[in-house]
Amino acid sequence: MELITILLSGLLGSLSPVGFIVDRVTENAIRSRFEKVEQLAVRIDNVPSSQLIQGKVERLRIAGRGLWVTPDLRIAALELETDPLNVDLQSLRQQRQMSSTQGERRLPTASLREPVQAGLRLVLTEQDVNKLLQSPLVKARLRNVGSGFLGTMGGRQDQAYELVNPKVEFLADNRVRLQVSLQEKGETATEETSSKQLTVNIESGLSIVAGHQVQFISPTGSINDSSIPSFFLGPILESMAEQFDIRKLEESGITARILALNVQADKMEIATFVRLKPKN
Protein backbone atom coordinates (compact mmCIF):
# COMPACT_ATOMS: atom_id res chain seq x y z
CA MET A 1 0.00 0.00 0.00
CA GLU A 2 2.80 2.40 0.93
CA LEU A 3 4.67 1.68 -2.32
CA ILE A 4 1.56 2.28 -4.45
CA THR A 5 0.91 5.57 -2.65
CA ILE A 6 4.47 6.71 -3.31
CA LEU A 7 4.38 5.90 -7.03
CA LEU A 8 0.95 7.33 -7.80
CA SER A 9 1.36 10.41 -5.61
CA GLY A 10 4.74 11.06 -7.18
CA LEU A 11 3.36 10.83 -10.69
CA LEU A 12 0.31 13.01 -10.15
CA GLY A 13 2.19 15.37 -7.87
CA SER A 14 4.51 16.26 -10.76
CA LEU A 15 1.76 18.00 -12.70
CA SER A 16 2.59 21.67 -13.05
CA PRO A 17 -0.01 24.43 -12.56
CA VAL A 18 -0.64 24.42 -16.31
CA GLY A 19 -0.88 20.67 -16.52
CA PHE A 20 2.40 19.68 -18.21
CA ILE A 21 4.47 16.69 -17.20
CA VAL A 22 8.10 16.10 -18.12
CA ASP A 23 10.19 13.03 -17.41
CA ARG A 24 12.65 14.82 -15.14
CA VAL A 25 9.96 16.55 -13.07
CA THR A 26 8.12 13.27 -12.57
CA GLU A 27 11.33 11.47 -11.65
CA ASN A 28 12.15 14.10 -9.04
CA ALA A 29 8.62 13.98 -7.63
CA ILE A 30 8.74 10.19 -7.25
CA ARG A 31 12.29 10.25 -5.92
CA SER A 32 11.33 12.74 -3.20
CA ARG A 33 8.72 10.36 -1.79
CA PHE A 34 11.18 7.55 -1.09
CA GLU A 35 13.44 7.54 1.95
CA LYS A 36 16.41 6.92 -0.35
CA VAL A 37 16.93 6.13 -4.04
CA GLU A 38 20.05 4.63 -5.57
CA GLN A 39 18.90 4.66 -9.22
CA LEU A 40 15.67 5.85 -10.85
CA ALA A 41 14.59 6.44 -14.45
CA VAL A 42 11.18 7.63 -15.68
CA ARG A 43 9.81 7.78 -19.20
CA ILE A 44 6.46 9.26 -20.21
CA ASP A 45 4.95 8.50 -23.61
CA ASN A 46 2.34 10.95 -24.81
CA VAL A 47 1.21 11.48 -28.40
CA PRO A 48 -0.11 14.02 -29.15
CA SER A 49 1.55 16.18 -26.50
CA SER A 50 -1.56 18.39 -26.34
CA GLN A 51 -3.17 15.66 -24.20
CA LEU A 52 -0.89 16.62 -21.33
CA ILE A 53 -2.77 19.82 -20.60
CA GLN A 54 -5.95 17.74 -20.38
CA GLY A 55 -4.41 15.49 -17.73
CA LYS A 56 -3.93 12.53 -20.07
CA VAL A 57 -0.83 10.34 -20.36
CA GLU A 58 -0.51 7.47 -22.83
CA ARG A 59 1.97 5.43 -20.80
CA LEU A 60 4.33 5.81 -17.86
CA ARG A 61 7.38 3.60 -17.34
CA ILE A 62 9.48 3.58 -14.18
CA ALA A 63 12.65 1.59 -13.50
CA GLY A 64 14.58 1.82 -10.26
CA ARG A 65 17.20 0.10 -8.14
CA GLY A 66 17.81 0.40 -4.43
CA LEU A 67 14.52 2.07 -3.47
CA TRP A 68 13.98 2.55 0.26
CA VAL A 69 10.22 2.69 0.91
CA THR A 70 10.91 3.08 4.64
CA PRO A 71 14.15 3.06 6.63
CA ASP A 72 13.67 -0.72 7.03
CA LEU A 73 12.24 -1.70 3.64
CA ARG A 74 14.50 -1.68 0.57
CA ILE A 75 13.43 -2.84 -2.89
CA ALA A 76 16.40 -4.10 -4.89
CA ALA A 77 14.74 -3.49 -8.27
CA LEU A 78 11.41 -2.12 -9.50
CA GLU A 79 9.82 -1.89 -12.95
CA LEU A 80 6.39 -0.35 -13.51
CA GLU A 81 4.42 0.29 -16.71
CA THR A 82 0.96 1.84 -16.77
CA ASP A 83 -1.94 1.85 -19.17
CA PRO A 84 -3.24 5.30 -20.23
CA LEU A 85 -3.90 7.75 -17.38
CA ASN A 86 -6.73 10.28 -17.27
CA VAL A 87 -6.65 12.82 -14.44
CA ASP A 88 -8.87 15.74 -13.44
CA LEU A 89 -6.23 18.44 -12.91
CA GLN A 90 -8.46 20.85 -11.00
CA SER A 91 -9.51 18.15 -8.55
CA LEU A 92 -5.88 17.07 -8.23
CA ARG A 93 -4.73 20.56 -7.24
CA GLN A 94 -7.46 20.76 -4.61
CA GLN A 95 -6.42 17.40 -3.18
CA ARG A 96 -2.79 18.45 -3.09
CA GLN A 97 -3.68 21.60 -1.17
CA MET A 98 -5.73 19.61 1.35
CA SER A 99 -2.97 17.03 1.82
CA SER A 100 -0.40 19.78 2.29
CA THR A 101 -2.58 21.51 4.88
CA GLN A 102 -3.33 18.32 6.80
CA GLY A 103 0.21 16.97 6.51
CA GLU A 104 -0.99 13.59 5.25
CA ARG A 105 -0.02 11.47 2.25
CA ARG A 106 -3.04 9.88 0.64
CA LEU A 107 -3.81 8.15 -2.62
CA PRO A 108 -5.16 10.87 -4.96
CA THR A 109 -7.78 8.52 -6.42
CA ALA A 110 -10.53 11.17 -6.29
CA SER A 111 -8.69 12.95 -9.12
CA LEU A 112 -8.89 9.97 -11.50
CA ARG A 113 -11.42 10.13 -14.32
CA GLU A 114 -10.76 6.49 -15.18
CA PRO A 115 -9.22 3.52 -13.35
CA VAL A 116 -5.43 3.25 -13.38
CA GLN A 117 -3.95 -0.09 -14.42
CA ALA A 118 -0.30 -1.03 -14.20
CA GLY A 119 2.09 -3.96 -14.31
CA LEU A 120 4.64 -4.03 -11.50
CA ARG A 121 7.76 -6.17 -11.09
CA LEU A 122 9.68 -6.22 -7.81
CA VAL A 123 12.94 -7.85 -6.75
CA LEU A 124 13.71 -8.37 -3.06
CA THR A 125 17.05 -9.69 -1.85
CA GLU A 126 17.52 -12.06 1.05
CA GLN A 127 19.64 -9.45 2.83
CA ASP A 128 16.96 -6.75 2.52
CA VAL A 129 14.19 -9.04 3.73
CA ASN A 130 16.23 -10.01 6.78
CA LYS A 131 16.77 -6.33 7.58
CA LEU A 132 13.00 -5.81 7.40
CA LEU A 133 12.45 -8.77 9.74
CA GLN A 134 14.49 -6.96 12.38
CA SER A 135 12.33 -3.81 12.20
CA PRO A 136 10.21 -2.82 15.24
CA LEU A 137 6.96 -3.28 13.29
CA VAL A 138 7.73 -6.85 12.23
CA LYS A 139 9.02 -7.75 15.69
CA ALA A 140 5.76 -6.55 17.23
CA ARG A 141 3.71 -8.66 14.82
CA LEU A 142 5.84 -11.71 15.52
CA ARG A 143 5.20 -11.33 19.23
CA ASN A 144 1.47 -11.41 18.55
CA VAL A 145 1.85 -14.53 16.41
CA GLY A 146 3.79 -16.21 19.19
CA SER A 147 1.14 -15.37 21.77
CA GLY A 148 -1.68 -16.58 19.58
CA PHE A 149 -0.30 -19.91 18.45
CA LEU A 150 2.43 -21.00 20.82
CA GLY A 151 0.94 -20.30 24.23
CA THR A 152 -0.06 -23.92 24.74
CA MET A 153 3.15 -25.60 23.58
CA GLY A 154 4.19 -28.55 25.67
CA GLY A 155 0.86 -28.59 27.46
CA ARG A 156 1.72 -25.50 29.49
CA GLN A 157 -1.34 -23.42 28.87
CA ASP A 158 -0.29 -20.79 31.39
CA GLN A 159 2.98 -20.12 29.54
CA ALA A 160 3.03 -17.78 26.54
CA TYR A 161 5.85 -17.59 24.04
CA GLU A 162 7.02 -15.04 21.54
CA LEU A 163 9.01 -15.30 18.31
CA VAL A 164 12.37 -13.51 18.17
CA ASN A 165 15.44 -13.33 15.91
CA PRO A 166 13.72 -14.25 12.63
CA LYS A 167 15.88 -15.04 9.60
CA VAL A 168 14.92 -16.11 6.09
CA GLU A 169 16.97 -17.90 3.45
CA PHE A 170 15.95 -17.96 -0.22
CA LEU A 171 16.58 -21.32 -1.87
CA ALA A 172 16.30 -22.49 -5.46
CA ASP A 173 13.08 -23.80 -7.06
CA ASN A 174 10.70 -21.47 -5.21
CA ARG A 175 11.65 -22.69 -1.76
CA VAL A 176 12.45 -20.74 1.40
CA ARG A 177 13.86 -21.58 4.80
CA LEU A 178 12.79 -19.64 7.90
CA GLN A 179 14.57 -19.75 11.24
CA VAL A 180 13.18 -18.15 14.38
CA SER A 181 13.70 -18.53 18.12
CA LEU A 182 11.03 -19.05 20.78
CA GLN A 183 11.41 -17.48 24.18
CA GLU A 184 9.12 -17.00 27.14
CA LYS A 185 7.08 -13.87 26.75
CA GLY A 186 8.49 -10.89 28.58
CA GLU A 187 12.03 -12.29 28.82
CA THR A 188 14.90 -10.04 27.79
CA ALA A 189 17.81 -11.27 25.70
CA THR A 190 20.56 -12.40 28.08
CA GLU A 191 23.06 -15.24 28.05
CA GLU A 192 20.83 -17.17 30.45
CA THR A 193 17.60 -16.70 28.48
CA SER A 194 19.36 -17.44 25.18
CA SER A 195 20.29 -20.87 26.50
CA LYS A 196 16.58 -21.56 27.16
CA GLN A 197 15.39 -20.43 23.73
CA LEU A 198 14.01 -22.97 21.29
CA THR A 199 15.18 -22.80 17.68
CA VAL A 200 12.49 -23.32 15.06
CA ASN A 201 13.36 -24.15 11.45
CA ILE A 202 10.76 -24.29 8.68
CA GLU A 203 11.42 -25.07 5.02
CA SER A 204 8.70 -24.91 2.37
CA GLY A 205 7.94 -24.40 -1.26
CA LEU A 206 5.87 -21.38 -2.31
CA SER A 207 3.11 -20.92 -4.86
CA ILE A 208 0.30 -18.45 -5.49
CA VAL A 209 -3.40 -19.24 -5.01
CA ALA A 210 -5.83 -17.43 -7.35
CA GLY A 211 -3.40 -14.55 -7.73
CA HIS A 212 -3.91 -13.16 -4.25
CA GLN A 213 -2.45 -15.42 -1.56
CA VAL A 214 0.77 -17.33 -0.89
CA GLN A 215 0.48 -21.09 -0.43
CA PHE A 216 3.07 -23.18 1.41
CA ILE A 217 3.98 -26.39 -0.45
CA SER A 218 5.22 -29.52 1.36
CA PRO A 219 6.39 -27.65 4.48
CA THR A 220 8.63 -29.32 7.04
CA GLY A 221 9.67 -27.98 10.41
CA SER A 222 11.64 -28.74 13.53
CA ILE A 223 12.13 -27.39 17.05
CA ASN A 224 15.63 -28.01 18.39
CA ASP A 225 16.05 -30.77 15.76
CA SER A 226 12.76 -32.46 16.74
CA SER A 227 10.19 -32.61 13.93
CA ILE A 228 7.06 -30.48 14.18
CA PRO A 229 3.87 -32.51 13.52
CA SER A 230 2.03 -31.45 10.38
CA PHE A 231 -1.23 -30.97 12.31
CA PHE A 232 0.52 -28.26 14.34
CA LEU A 233 2.62 -26.70 11.58
CA GLY A 234 -0.20 -26.49 9.02
CA PRO A 235 -2.53 -24.08 10.89
CA ILE A 236 0.35 -21.74 11.75
CA LEU A 237 1.44 -21.46 8.11
CA GLU A 238 -2.16 -21.03 6.96
CA SER A 239 -2.56 -18.12 9.34
CA MET A 240 0.69 -16.59 8.08
CA ALA A 241 -0.55 -16.89 4.50
CA GLU A 242 -3.80 -15.12 5.41
CA GLN A 243 -1.80 -12.15 6.71
CA PHE A 244 -0.38 -11.65 3.20
CA ASP A 245 -3.70 -11.93 1.32
CA ILE A 246 -3.59 -8.90 -0.99
CA ARG A 247 -7.37 -8.84 -1.34
CA LYS A 248 -7.27 -6.72 1.81
CA LEU A 249 -6.17 -3.83 -0.43
CA GLU A 250 -9.61 -3.82 -2.06
CA GLU A 251 -10.95 -1.95 0.98
CA SER A 252 -8.81 0.99 -0.22
CA GLY A 253 -10.02 0.72 -3.83
CA ILE A 254 -6.94 -1.21 -4.99
CA THR A 255 -7.24 -4.47 -6.89
CA ALA A 256 -3.98 -6.40 -7.08
CA ARG A 257 -3.09 -9.82 -8.45
CA ILE A 258 0.19 -11.68 -8.23
CA LEU A 259 1.03 -12.93 -11.72
CA ALA A 260 4.32 -14.67 -10.95
CA LEU A 261 6.52 -15.53 -7.98
CA ASN A 262 10.08 -16.72 -8.55
CA VAL A 263 12.39 -17.53 -5.65
CA GLN A 264 16.05 -18.09 -6.44
CA ALA A 265 19.14 -18.25 -4.28
CA ASP A 266 19.48 -14.87 -2.51
CA LYS A 267 16.52 -13.12 -4.19
CA MET A 268 12.77 -13.17 -4.85
CA GLU A 269 11.03 -11.75 -7.93
CA ILE A 270 7.34 -10.82 -7.92
CA ALA A 271 5.23 -9.73 -10.90
CA THR A 272 1.85 -8.15 -10.15
CA PHE A 273 -1.08 -6.40 -11.78
CA VAL A 274 -2.54 -3.38 -9.97
CA ARG A 275 -5.78 -1.51 -10.64
CA LEU A 276 -6.93 1.63 -8.78
CA LYS A 277 -10.52 2.78 -9.01
CA PRO A 278 -11.54 6.45 -8.92
CA LYS A 279 -12.95 7.43 -5.54
CA ASN A 280 -15.95 9.73 -5.51
Which residues does each predicted region cover?
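Membrane-proximal interfacial segments on either side of biological membranes
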Residues: 28, 83-87, 276, 280
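Extracytoplasmic/luminal low-complexity segments enriched in Pro/Gly and acidic/polar residues
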Residues: 195-280
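Hydrophobic, Leu/Ile/Phe/Ala-enriched alpha-helical segments that form helix-helix packing faces
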Residues: 29-34, 133-142, 146-149, 240-244, ...
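Hydrophobic membrane-insertion alpha-helices, especially the h-region
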Residues: 2-17
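Alpha-helical transmembrane signal-anchor/signal-peptide segments
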Residues: 21-37
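Short, flexible segments with low predicted structural confidence
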Residues: 1-2, 33-34, 233
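Short amphipathic alpha-helical segments
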Residues: 17-26, 121, 125-129, 133, ...
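N-terminal beta-strand/beta-hairpin edge segment
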Residues: 35-128, 136-193
